[in-house]
Amino acid sequence: MERISSAPSISLGYPPTESSAHLAPSFSDSATSTLSFKSLLEDPVNPIRPVYTPTRTEITPVTLSPIPITPVREFQPYLHEISQEYARYSKQKRASLRRYLEKHGKLEGSMKESSINGSLLRRSSVSTILRPASESSYPNSNSETITYDIDDNVNPSSSLVDNFSISSVPSVFFQSDFNLDDPQIFDVVSEHIDITQTSDAPNSNRNLLLNNSMLQEKISWYLDTVELHLLQEIENASDSFPMIIDNLKQLKKETRDNVEETKHLLEKLTEVNVMCDRHMDAISSEELACHQLTQLKKVVQTLEDIYSEHKKVSEDVKDQRFLEAINGINSIVTQLKKKSTELNVDLLSLPSVKSLREEHKVLYHTVSQSVVQQFSKFLTSDMHKFSTILDSNELKDIYLSKNRLIPSVTKSLPSAMEFDADFLHEVDVCIDCLTLTDSLQAALTLYKTAVFEAFENLAQQYFTDGVEMRSVRKSSDLRRSLSAASLSSLSDSSRRSSSAANPFQSMSITEFAEMLTNIYFSSLECLRRIRSQIKVLIDILSKKDTKQYHLSVILNDLMATSSDVVTQQVTTINNLRFRVLDTYPPNNVIYLFSLHIIFHNELESLCGITQSSFIPTIMRQLLDWFKNFQRYSTQKLASSFERELWEAIPVEPSCQDLANRVFECSGNTPVEWTRLLSPEAEKEDENHRVHHVKVSEDCTATVSFGKQSLHIVRSSVTLLETLDDYGKLLAHFSRLAPEFQTGMLDMFRTLNSRVYQLILGAGTVRSSGLSKVLGKHIALASQTIALFQLSLNSMCRYLSRVTGTRLTNETNKLDQDFTVHHLQIHDKFVSLMRERVAISCSQIASLSWDIDSPHGYIIDLSKSLIKLYKVLHRYSQRDCVEVIPDVIRMFEDRLQLELTDIARNPSKWPGVRIDLSYFYDMMASKCGYAGDRTLLEKFERTPEQQEAA
């Protein structure tokens, strides 16, 4: 295409546009004269370099082919298919446009105020000759179809062809992969598929298109058509360009003014910004100051609350509300940490708070120490309070009744497991405080120490009270020294000094027993309470804090160790008292050592088996005392029988009770032996001797020993008392059985020898102070030996029953000795009467037989026999039954020997018969003899009968 002139020409026969129709005539003339087609292609704002553009006259005229108009309804099926995608696209497009307008709102405002014609703003930047005058509307995003505002029945211009159906458009244009870059699609669209591809060629030959002249000509024609259409479009828009250029100039001017004004505004704005920055800095500073002031107020308020709570904590500590104090301290620490986080201020680093924390540490330590002390004092106080519910006498009666040493009592021991609610609450609070202060271990250790000290003080206090009971009349200095003295120091001093320095020597047995009773039973009550306290503590620890439950093992040995402390104290006391223990009567020893054993048994029941030397020491002391008692009793009995006057004494009921107990012990242990009697006075021996010389209406002549009745002498009562003491000792202390058996046999052996020597020996008159030995002496000696034998058998059977031991050969031998000695006493009676009959019969040779009355010899013999009978019948009926017949037979034999020759003389026979008749009559009337008159019958028979006999 050749180059043509660029003179403007707009006479193409096209109708004028809407914009050119409204322009002023003057403006149109000037624009026509000044503008050219070339200027339309230049940059209207910045025409830096010219661009060559051909004029209309330079373009070869081409006949435009009409473009068919397709009605919108033809596109409805297609638009219906893409309605949803198009609706989303339209919605996004409108949103983008709205954001763009909001972003450039100022520019649009300035454009609206300019003199640009509004119609230019409504004109689209892209237009075609086929676009109608009215704008098409966007489809509604909620509708399923797309509609336009144009009318399908608009009559086209005369240059347009008739409507045709869209179905005549090749379907390739509606494919989703439509792309002219694709050679095959291009071949189909260009309708030259037969040129590029033969029937037998699988692929198109693109070189054929380059050599096809028809195709080249058609493409040129297409390009010319496109160019003409572009020129036509430009021509349609050319009428508006002058107005646009003028508006652009005006816009440039206004823009320069606006730029200047904007520059001034920017300078002012800069100043305003600087002032704003300063004001903002000031505001920030003020806000910061206000914030800091608010923070400071909050900090001050927090500190005020903290100090107020700290004051309350101090008051709680002063008032011993330790748990509230500990919780208050912990609450203060928690508040400080919480407020530090909330206020973003390290309150813990403040000097006042540091000082407060130091005070808290002091209070915490004070609370810890106070709670530890209070915990120990509270439990020990409860222990002492429980031990004083009952007094010592009531406790003694209950424990003795429990061990069947006295009759049953109505009262019982208070329950050690009963704790009131206040006690449990106090213990619970203390454990909470100890757990929070990590001082539970220290508290339990101190509690153990306090318990040990309490038991030491308990024994020491009762010991001091017992000493002061005897020292009340002494000077105050001595009493103070005794109160301050400890048991160990007193024990050491008593070993170094004489026995008179021992304060126990001045204590009576009643006072000493009362002291032991207080120590023993108060200690047992304290131990019972401690065991219950330990159970309560372990239960609370197991429920409250399992982490510190292991600390309860500290209390495992508390009971055993406490019992050891008590036993050490009482062992020391008993060792001190044992120096004067030999003077105690058996009842007192039984009472004291029964207390020891009861205390030890209760200790084992409460605390288990202990390793203390208490019971071995007690039993060793008891054995030593028993040996001394055995020796003393044997010597006392031997001396008593040695000085015995052998006079029968009346038997009082108390003596009969002694005999009954000794006799009954072989079958059943007498109740009196198992019962515990209170300590007796030291003048017990004198009181016992009073009833020996006192005769009352209740006294009897003999003592009943089972079915036998025996006359007793003064020493026999002492024997029964000694055996009664032996029985009590064995009933209470079965461990003494071997020593008991040995001592008892030694005692009976000594007594048997002593009685045998005194009664039957030659020194009787000198040792006893008797002028001569009479029949009653021998009869009472026989009764005494019978008492020995019966008592020995009964006591040996009692020993065998209680201890399960068999009778030894020594016992049988001693019993046989008693039998032999009894037979010897019988022989002694016969021997004495033989001497009397020898003296009396010496008169027979000088007698005259012609008198009618009994002779003197037979009268003397009858009197001697009657006297013997009376003595034996009164003092020993057993011997009377055994000895009188023997004496009568001895008399008959001697008389037969002396009177046989005389009786053969008929002149003398009547006198012999009178003597013998008198003898037998006196025996029958005075002695109750009912036997045959053997001698008289012999002398009355004839000589033949006598020879036959």
From Swiss-Prot:
One of its GO terms (molecular function) is syntaxin binding. Signal peptide: none annotated. Residues 243-312 form a coiled coil. This is Vacuolar protein sorting-associated protein 54. InterPro entries: Vps54, Vps54_C. Residues 1-25 are annotated as: Disordered. Keywords: Coiled coil, Endosome, Golgi apparatus, Membrane, Phosphoprotein, Protein transport, Transport. Belongs to the VPS54 family. PANTHER family: VACUOLAR PROTEIN SORTING 54, VACUOLAR PROTEIN SORTING-ASSOCIATED PROTEIN 54. Involved in retrograde transport from early and late endosomes to late Golgi by linking the vesicle through the t-SNARE TGL1 to the Golgi, leading to the membrane fusion between late Golgi and endosomal vesicles. Also seems to be involved in protein transport from Golgi to the plasma membrane and is required for the integrity of the actin cytoskeleton. Component of the Golgi-associated retrograde protein (GARP) complex, also called VFT (VPS fifty-three) complex. The modification Phosphoserine is found at residue 483. GO terms for biological process: Golgi to vacuole transport; intracellular protein transport; retrograde transport, endosome to Golgi. It is found in: Golgi apparatus, trans-Golgi network membrane; Endosome membrane. Disulfide bonds: none annotated. One of its GO terms (cellular component) is Golgi apparatus. It is a peripheral membrane protein.
